[in-house]
Each structure stands twice: as structure tokens, then as C-alpha cells.
Amino acid sequence: AKKLLAEAGYPNGFETELWSAYNYSTAQKVSEFLQQQLAQVGIKAKIQALEAGQRVEKVESQQDPATAPIRLYYVGWSSSTGEADWALRPLLASESAPPRMFNTAYYKNAKVDAAIKGAQLTTDSAEKAKLYKEAQDEIWKDAPWAFLVTERLLSVNNRKLSGVYVMPDASFTFEEADLK
């Protein structure tokens, strides 16, 4: 990494800011870990947890990637709908760049866009899964982001309680809850 930095014109590293969309425990730990890792190759990163208003101003309102102030940004996402579309389209479809949605990498890939659009238009579950896999494979190859962490959801309860489930978006469902 130091060699690549030197080749890019930064033989002594550089200073930057690492923005976090959150200030909760996991985000703080991940940001500090990134800060430590970057320091090992000469990049001094100052961590700044953005308040909601700052996030909108500095990240989510920036239409032009050339003038957007974003450089390093830690953000998390879960598909609140449980659908693959909401896991990919708002973050990685070309049409989803700020201020419309959350493609803060300003990522553009025609194959990804076509696969996501095709998946939206079909009702065939197998075809939909195939298209989302194609999109994910392209995204993985391009690496528009560094995918860092997948949080594990943990839920414990009394043996007398059943029917309470943790959903993919970290919410709970109580519709089938039963206390014996």
C-alpha cells in the first residue's frame, strides 16, 4: 500500500477525514480500526461522526462527484424491505446518485443497471435471483466500495417465549409471540 501511495504521488502519505454516518458503538469501532489501518501506511485520518443535517449537506445533497467533499465515508445499510432490490438499487444503481438516493460512490456500471432494472420488471423469482446475482458479481468485481463489516444480530429470550423473530433489518416481529 505504501508503494502504491508513493506511485500515486504521496510518498509521505496524506491527511484526510473519515466521515461516519453514525455515532453508535459499531461505527465508532470500525472507524477507529480504519483510522489505525490507514495510519500504518501513512494516511492520517481524522474521524468525524456526522449529524443528520451534516450528512444531508455534505453527502446526500451533492450532485457532482467532482465537487462533492466526500472522500472516506463509513455507512451501513440493511434492506428494510427484506428485498434484494432495496439492498442494491438505492446504493449502487447509476440513477441513485445523490441527491436522488444514496449511491455516494457515484458508481456507474451499465451491466449492473440493466440487471437491477430487469429484476424489477420480472415476476419470475428464479430470473429475479439470477439478475441480482449478476449485479452483485459485477459490483464485487468493480469494488466501488470496500465492504467491511456484517453485523451479527443476536437475540436471546426466556424459554417460555416463542414466536419472536429478528428480521434482516434488525427489527423484531411479535405477530406470533406466545408466552407459556
Residues covered by each model-derived region:
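Thiotemplate assembly-line natural product biosynthesis machinery
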Residues: 1-2, 33
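Immediate post-signal peptide segment of exported/extracytoplasmic ligand-binding proteins
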Residues: 2-17
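Short, well-ordered beta-strand elements
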Residues: 13-22, 45-46, 71-72
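Detector for C-terminal structural segments
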Residues: 22, 26-36, 40, 60-180
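Short helix-initiation/N-cap motifs at beta->coil->alpha
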Residues: 22-23, 47-60
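FAD-dependent oxidoreductase catalytic-site/capping-region signature
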Residues: 38, 44-47
